Amino acid sequence: MSNAELETAIEAAWEARDSISPATKGAERDAIEATLAALDGGGLRVAERQADGNWHVNQWAKKAVLLGFRIKDMEMQSGGAQGGGWWDKVDSKFAGWGEADWKDAGFRAVPNCVVRKSAYIAPGVVLMPSFVNLGAYVDEGTMVDTWATVGSCAQIGKNVHLSGGVGIGGVLEPMQAGPTIIEDNCFIGARSEVVEGCIVREGSVLGMGVFIGKSTKIVDRETGEFTYGEVPAGSVVVAGSMPSKNGVNLYCAVIVKKVDAQTRSKTSINELLRD
C-alpha cells in the first residue's frame, strides 16, 4: 500500500479504535502493521521538514503508533539478566535479527541499548547504552550517548550529539501536539532536556543542564528578547535565570551567542560555551 492508502486506512481505523483489539484481523490490522513497518524502516516518519523550514507532522502516523498498542497482548520479552525478561506489548527493533540484518542496517548498537519496534535508526548512528522509543527517527551520523533517551516520535537530525543522560521528550498525546525535534548538526550537552514538542534548530549548541519545555523562557542576551518553544539556528545556549516577582529569580535558557557553520567547524564546543 502507498502512504496515501495507508493514511486513509489508518484514519478509518482510528475512528473505529474502540473496536480494535488483539483479535482484529484483515485490512485494519494489515494497515496498522504496514505503517509501523514503514516507520521502522524509515520510509515514513512522523514529521518531515519542508523546504521553507517548517515541519509537517503526519498525525496519522502517530495514530498508527497508538493503534499498535491495541492489536497486541502483553507478552514476555526475553533478554533480561540471568535469564529474566520483561512484560510488554512492543517488541525490540532487533527481535529476530541476525548478522546480515545488522550489516544491512549499518549502525552500531552497544550492549544494553534499547530500541523499540517502529523507531528508525539510520546508517552511521552510534547507540551507547541508551533508549529510543517507538516511532522515533534518528538520522545519519548521530551519537546517542550513555543513558540518553529519545522519546516516542522524536525527530533527531544528522550528525547530532546527544550527550550522556540527555532526555528528548516523547509526544504521542495530545494528538494535535507536534514531536520534539533536534535538527541537523546540533550538540545537546550532558543531562539537558528538550521536551513538549520544542524544536532546536540546525547547528545549535546546548550547554550542560539546559532544560527547555514549552513554558521555558528562551532569552537572547544580546537583544533582551525572549521566545518560547524554539531555539533559533546556530544558537549557543546555557542555563540561566531571570528576575521575577518579590526578588525571586526563575529559570530560563539564555542564548549567549550565535555561530555559523564555519565557526562551528573551527571552534571546540567548550570554547563556544565560554563567556
Curated annotation (Swiss-Prot):
Cell location: Cytoplasm
EC numbers for this chain: 2.3.1.117
Pfam families: Hexapep_2 (PF14602), THDPS_N_2 (PF14805)
GO annotation (BP), single: lysine biosynthetic process via diaminopimelate
Binding of substrate, residues: R108, D145
GO molecular function: 2,3,4,5-tetrahydropyridine-2,6-dicarboxylate N-succinyltransferase activity; nucleotidyltransferase activity
Annotated Gene Ontology cellular component terms: cytoplasm
Catalytic reactions on record: (S)-2,3,4,5-tetrahydrodipicolinate + succinyl-CoA + H2O = (S)-2-succinylamino-6-oxoheptanedioate + CoA
Source superkingdom: Bacteria
Keywords from the named record: Acyltransferase, Amino-acid biosynthesis, Cytoplasm, Diaminopimelate biosynthesis, Lysine biosynthesis, Repeat, Transferase
Pathway in which this enzyme or protein is active: Amino-acid biosynthesis; L-lysine biosynthesis via DAP pathway; LL-2,6-diaminopimelate from (S)-tetrahydrodipicolinate (succinylase route): step 1/3
Family designation: Belongs to the transferase hexapeptide repeat family.
Protein name as catalogued: 2,3,4,5-tetrahydropyridine-2,6-dicarboxylate N-succinyltransferase
Organism this protein belongs to: Roseobacter denitrificans (strain ATCC 33942 / OCh 114)
